């Protein structure tokens, strides 16, 4: 019997196992159905030379091919140019009958089981030959590669689609990729803090109730209540406020008015001693605060006084400088008006002016005994 169409690769025909004479017809039908499904991979040899796409008006006529044309469907698409063919086969080592779920319909169930056992050897060789010219089809591989990455982000989807067909799995991943990939982890990340908030808030709400700041007033209240409880237990006939706040004479009269045992007297004196110590400590703190306030006021007063004195000193310095300048001008003016017998003016470097006790002014040469004496 003559081989199938010339478009079928020789390696696939030569490497098929030789069937028995009784199963020859079924084997040929199986091969023809596989070649129909491999319409995209059939023209592997013309991919090495620049192809010229020829438009096909319709399916090829029946007499041009052998029994392969009998099983061809009228709506089956024609082979595309070589640069678009290896898109699904460059990185996916699946058999050619798993390219799409719609292409597996013509294969009968008993024939596909035998085809799966007989075709794994020629598929890697054909894929290797076609993968050499799979350069221009890389943009079509992005959806499949990304769909493979999506398995790492959604484990539930991978478990649900594990038993389905390869073509259906690939198409579902492409459809689900833009929706599931960006939002697969966001709901989980938002829900976990919601479950963690209630246990985190409970210790925070309990911390302020047992804080160290509130322990001091409670301790004082406990001390007062403790003295009262001890006084009630010892049956003291007067309240603890009188024990602490009464003066010495009134306190002694109060003790003399009631007959008390030694233990009661010891308790009363202990309560008074601790109460007086507490009052004394409060008064001491009050006096310290008052002293600090007085010192701060005194410092403010001294600071303002210092600023006032500095301003007065500056004004005195300016006034003194003005007086010195005026005295110098007067001294120069006097020497300009003084003349000797010859009518010559006196030089300030050689003569000086001295004032006597009665207010008289004398012109004295510099360096004389009178100047030194004066």
Swiss-Prot record:
Modified positions (Phosphoserine) are 158, 171
Q: Where is this region: Required for interaction with MAPK8?
A: 1-83
- Cross-linked residues, Glycyl lysine isopeptide (Lys-Gly) (interchain with G-Cter in SUMO): 369
Record's comment on post-translational modification: Phosphorylated on serine residues. In undifferentiated erythrocytes, phosphorylated by MAPK8 which then leads to ubiquitination and protein degradation.
From the record, give the cysteines joined by S-S bonds. none
Which parts of this chain are annotated as the region Basic motif? 269-288
State what this protein does.
Answer: Component of the NF-E2 complex essential for regulating erythroid and megakaryocytic maturation and differentiation. Binds to the hypersensitive site 2 (HS2) of the beta-globin control region (LCR). This subunit (NFE2) recognizes the TCAT/C sequence of the AP-1-like core palindrome present in a number of erythroid and megakaryocytic gene promoters. Requires MAFK or other small MAF proteins for binding to the NF-E2 motif. May play a role in all aspects of hemoglobin production from globin and heme synthesis to procurement of iron.
Report motif location: PXY motif 2.
79-83
Give the primary localization class.
nucleus
* Residue stretches of biased makeup (Pro residues): 48-61
Q: Where is this motif: PXY motif 1?
A: 61-65
Q: Where is this region: Leucine-zipper?
A: 292-299
Q: Which PANTHER family match?
A: NUCLEAR FACTOR ERYTHROID 2-RELATED FACTOR, TRANSCRIPTION FACTOR NF-E2 45 KDA SUBUNIT
**What GO terms fall under cellular component here?**
cytoplasm; nucleus
**Region Transactivation domain: start-end pairs:** 1-207
Cited SMART domains: BRLZ (SM00338)
Q: Which UniProt keywords apply?
A: Activator, Cytoplasm, DNA-binding, Isopeptide bond, Nucleus, Phosphoprotein, Transcription, Transcription regulation, Ubl conjugation
Ranges for the region named Disordered are: 1-21, 40-61, 132-165, 207-227
Origin superkingdom: Eukaryota
bZIP domain mapped to chain residues = 267-330
Pfam families per the UniProt record, alphabetical: bZIP_Maf
Q: Name one GO biological process term.
A: regulation of transcription by RNA polymerase II
> What gene, per UniProt, encodes this protein?
NFE2
Q: What is this protein called?
A: Transcription factor NF-E2 45 kDa subunit
